[in-house]
Curated annotation (Swiss-Prot):
Forms oxaloacetate, a four-carbon dicarboxylic acid source for the tricarboxylic acid cycle. This is Phosphoenolpyruvate carboxylase. Keywords: Carbon dioxide fixation, Lyase, Magnesium. Residues 52-71 are annotated as: Disordered. It catalyses: oxaloacetate + phosphate = phosphoenolpyruvate + hydrogencarbonate. Belongs to the PEPCase type 1 family. NCBIfam families: PRK00009.1 (NF000584). GO terms for biological process: carbon fixation; oxaloacetate metabolic process; tricarboxylic acid cycle. InterPro entries: PEP_COase, PEP_COase_bac/pln-type, PEP_COase_Lys_AS, PEPCASE_His_AS, Pyrv/PenolPyrv_kinase-like_dom. Residues 60-70 have a biased composition (Polar residues). Its cofactor is Mg(2+).
């Protein structure tokens, strides 16, 4: 599997990637011959050759269908897994190539740092007039917080992810130019071992993961990857500042992490008060265990003897205090360590951590106490010639404690507004609660939200469940500290009454501090196009409400608003979603400023472009002026977590890119663009008319039947991807009730990728028809928002395939002739205008590396898609009861996901 079409040209810096792909492709061939047969490998080669020829000649998929249809499920599954394995090694090779390129930049010694890194950001800031004093004043305001979620978009199981890490490690080791032939042979053998073990591991688990499984999955990235790279991130920043400005200020904490795993109740009956408590306990154990192990490693390093060097009086005094506090632990210290005060203090610090784990006497009451002990050691080492005798290693632990605390990641809780509303209606005995407008409900809720009257308790499941949740949060605040809790997010928030409802429920649940305030940041999530449009009015009403304003004063007069990229796109199409999000941020910032409140945004992005995915640096550059202001809180979902944080070097790069982008957007935001006043009405028209086209398509009679037949949504719903159901419980199969993740996932599998582009062509054409073509070209050239939008659409279009999409569409029978012509015509219109406005002859002409990556994969995805259509038709003929066909279909889903590097 190592031939390439002559038209695939690698740039000189990417030639090592070409060599790796060829070598690893040949290794996949050897694997297939060994694990299946030489005849099987020959068959794979024939299919591959046909697929490439089809692409080169633009022939219809029927040329592949003749070779692939009618296979036994087991044979089909083997063929799919063969191509999936190729994608696996190509993906790994590309990740390792990113590490190679990063090292080349670092070794080059040139004045051109790697783009989007910290060195690049700081040099750009200095060139724009930012002084070291200004930078030092801004650093304490920087707060970057990736928030990991358990959305069911990760189509690769944990056992396979671990083997991928082994393969990556062997390739990274092989980058060392000093490796001997024997060592290189050992690297290759390690890769082959992990690859073979992957082949012998089923692609997906036979059972749906539990919340505990999802917590363990996310915990893997937090404790095994990010825990290790956090200190390196700060060291890189220090080096970049020193190299740029000549000196380094004391760095505050800039990074922390959040999680939804165990706290996201929206539509998931498996998440409740018990999972909230269990998650916080598990995360506490995990991070304290890491601290104990690291202190144990430091013990042997910090062996300084008082007969040779001194220690500070403060450290000696702390050691004596701890001996009195923990006499049993002090008695266990080895006599031969009696002249090693650092080691003795280390022993007692570990004892305090164990007491913290056990909730025993002598426990640390807060992470700040552990930080204080570590700082004592650092100060003593620095004062006594110990900078090169352990100071560096101790400071690394200090950075970890500052970043992870005793909680590892802040836990958010999320629930849908209607759940709260039903509970309050039942508690108040108001059967017409939904019929009342927001103002009426807010007036009723005011006394309960203010704590002037107790919200009645009622004995029903909904109220009991919510009471238990808020009681768990109150207990968690006492047990784990305020830093362990993130925000309480209200999904499908529509008005201020939705927020006051949560405030009233929190009081009833006992989440009240000593001052009588509710110590909880309540965050409305605006998800639909209409809610984005009405979000400014909602926030204005909320901030003008005296009860809520009193609550906000206790929270530092800072309000967070979450913006939903997924459901807004599903609701009105991607153009309306993107523009609605952009306008909402501008209007919300203006409203909050007028009312004297600092507004921060929480971006609910997914992995796909349709759900807000894309490069953080470009997204922040395109964001409205003032919308960052030092703060970035963004969800990291599904396959994005693996892609960005699965490898330490790439996790470091991701953190650098986010931090650098926040620094640039905050310290030197783009200058105001007076032409935006002229551009906005044009974008209003594009969004409005694209929404009309999109809703006409998805709102047509029998569309949902078409969707369910023309995509493998029924297979996706049977897969064991996550603990949350694909639609909200107790609701029908209408599009509004289907979650955005399976919606995007299904269309990506069918290669039509409808959510990522449909309606855009109609919107652009409407603007042209209204006489705005020159304005659109100006916008594409000079407006980062519009340029980024078009670039993202171009990328989505490049990953789609109309011929394959037509095969899927024909599964819908007579509905095909009604819906597919609409897809074909809108696609042609969208492609034409995207290329015209970007002034490109072909899609992704501006990004040849990405274009090459997609072209490398497409011929290998095609056979899987053709098989998928055949298997889907046969499986449905059994009413979905043939398990062998289902297993083959699941393999197809995983294979396409590996190929397009995207799920939901």
């Amino acid at each position: 599997m190592n031939e390439y079409r002559s038209s695939l040209v690698f740039a000189t810096p990417d030639l090592p990637l070409r060599d790796d792909v060829r070598r690893l492709g040949a290794l996949v061939g050897d694997l297939l011959a060994e694990q299946v047969s030489a005849e099987f490998l020959d068959e794979i080669e024939r299919v591959r050759t046909t697929a490439i020829s089809r692409r080169e000649s633009d022939a219809p998929p029927s040329t592949l269908s003749e070779q692939l249809t009618g296979r036994q499920p087991r044979d089909a599954e083997a063929l799919v897994r063969a191509f999936s394995t190729y994608f696996q090694v190509v993906n790994i090779a590309e990740r390792v190539h990113r590490i190679r390129r990063r090292r080349e930049y670092q070794r080059s010694g040139t004045d051109t740092p790697q783009p989007d890194g910290l060195h690049d950001a700081l040099r750009r800031l200095k060139a724009q007039g930012v002084t070291l004093d200004e930078l030092s004043q801004w650093l304490p305001r920087i707060d970057v917080e990736p928030v990991f979620t358990a959305h069911p978009t990760e189509a690769v199981r944990r056992a396979l992810l671990e083997k991928e890490q082994l393969m990556v490690a062997s390739l990274v080791d092989n980058l060392d130019g000093m490796r001997t032939p024997n060592e290189r042979a050992s690297d290759a053998a390690r890769f082959r071992m992990a690859l073979t073990a992957s082949w012998q591991t089923a692609d997906s688990s036979p059972v749906r993961p539990t919340v505990d499984d999802e917590r363990e999955h996310v915990g893997f990235y937090l404790t095994q990857v990010l825990y290790r790279v956090i200190p390196v991130m700060y060291e890189t920043l220090e080096h970049a500042i020193e190299e740029t400005y000549g000196s380094v200020p004391a760095l505050p904490r800039l990074l922390r992490f959040g999680t939804w795993v165990g706290g996201d109740m929206d539509g998931n009956p498996n998440v409740d008060a018990k999972t909230i408590a269990g998650t916080l306990d598990a995360q506490r154990r995990a991070v304290l265990d890491r601290y104990q192990k690291e202190l144990w490693q430091l013990a042997s390093l910090l062996s300084q003897s008082t007969t040779l060097v001194q220690v500070s009086a403060e450290l000696t005094a702390q050691l004596e205090r701890y001996r009195a506090l923990l006499p049993d632990a002090a008695a266990r210290s080895r006599p031969r360590h009696g002249d090693m005060p650092y080691r003795l203090l280390n022993d007692l610090m570990r004892a305090r951590l164990q007491a913290t784990l056990d909730d025993a006497e002598g426990a640390y009451s807060a992470p700040s106490e552990l930080e204080h002990d570590l700082q004592l050691i650092l100060d003593s080492l620095q004062a006594n010639k110990g900078l090169h005798a352990g100071w560096f290693a101790v400071r690394r632990l200090l950075w970890r404690v500052r970043s992870f605390g005793f909680h590892l990641a802040r836990l958010d809780v999320r629930q849908e507004s209607s759940v709260h509303a039903r509970a309050v209606a039942d508690a108040l005995g108001q059967t017409d609660w939904d019929a009342q407008d927001a103002t009426q409900r807010a007036a009723v809720l005011g006394p309960y939200a203010a704590g002037q009257e107790p919200l009645p308790r009622v004995d029903d499941e909904g109220n009991a469940r919510l009471d238990a949740v808020f009681a768990a949060l109150a207990d968690a605040r006492t047990r784990h500290g305020a830093d362990a809790l993130g925000s309480y997010i209200i999904s499908m928030a529509h008005n201020r009454a939705d927020v006051l409802t949560v405030l009233a429920l929190a009081r009833r649940g006992g989440l009240v501090d000593d001052a009588g305030a509710v110590p909880l940041d309540i965050v409305p999530l605006f998800e639909t196009v209409d809610d984005l449009r009405g979000g400014t009015g909602t926030v204005q009403d909320l901030l003008a409400d005296p009860v809520y304003r009193q609550h906000l004063a206790a929270r530092g007069d800072t309000q967070m608003v979450m913006l939903g990229y997924s459901d807004s796109g599903k609701d009105g199409g991607i153009a309306a979603s993107r523009w609605g999000l952009q306008r909402a941020q501008v209007e919300l910032l203006e409203a909050a400023a007028e009312l004297g409140v600092r507004l921060t945004f929480f971006h609910g992005r997914g992995g796909s472009i349709a759900r807000g995915g894309g490069k953080t640096s470009r997204a922040l550059d395109a964001a409205p002026r003032g919308s960052v202001d030092g703060r970035l809180r963004v969800t990291e979902q599904g396959e994005v977590i693996h892609r960005k944080y699965g490898i330490r070097a790439l996790a470091l790069r991701s953190l650098e890119q986010m931090t650098g982008a926040v620094l640039l957007s905050s310290l030197r935001p783009r200058a105001p663009e007076p032409r935006e006043a002229h551009w906005r009405p044009v974008m209003d028209l594009v969004a409005e008319r694209s929404t009309v086209a999109y809703r006409a398509f998805v709102g047509a009679p029998e569309f949902m039947q078409y969707f369910r037949l023309a995509t493998p949504i029924d297979v996706i719903e049977r897969m064991t991807l996550g603990s949350r159901p694909s639609r909200r419980l107790g609701q029908d199969a209408a599009l509004s009730n289907l979650r955005a993740i399976p919606w995007v996932f299904a269309w990506s599998q069918a290669r039509a990728v409808i959510p990522g582009w449909y309606g855009v062509g109609s919107g652009l054409q409407a603007a042209v028809d209204a006489g705005h073509e020159d304005t659109l070209r100006e916008m594409a050239q000079d407006w980062p928002f519009f340029r980024t939008f078009l670039d993202d659409i171009a990328m989505v279009l490049s990953k789609g395939d109309l011929n394959i999409a037509e095969l899927f569409s024909r599964l819908s029978g007579d509905l095909h002739t009604r819906f597919f012509p609409l897809i074909r015509d809108e696609l042609a219109l969208t492609k034409a205008w995207v290329k015209a406005l970007l002034q490109q002859q072909s899609l992704l002409q501006h990004d040849p590396r990405l274009a090459l990556s997609i072209r490398l994969r497409n011929p290998y995805i095609d056979p899987i898609s053709v098989l998928q259509v055949d298997l889907l038709q046969r499986w449905r003929a059994t009413d979905g009861e043939d398990e062998a066909l289902l297993r083959a279909l699941v393999a197809c889903v995983n294979g396409v996901s590996q190929g397009v590097q995207n799920t939901g």
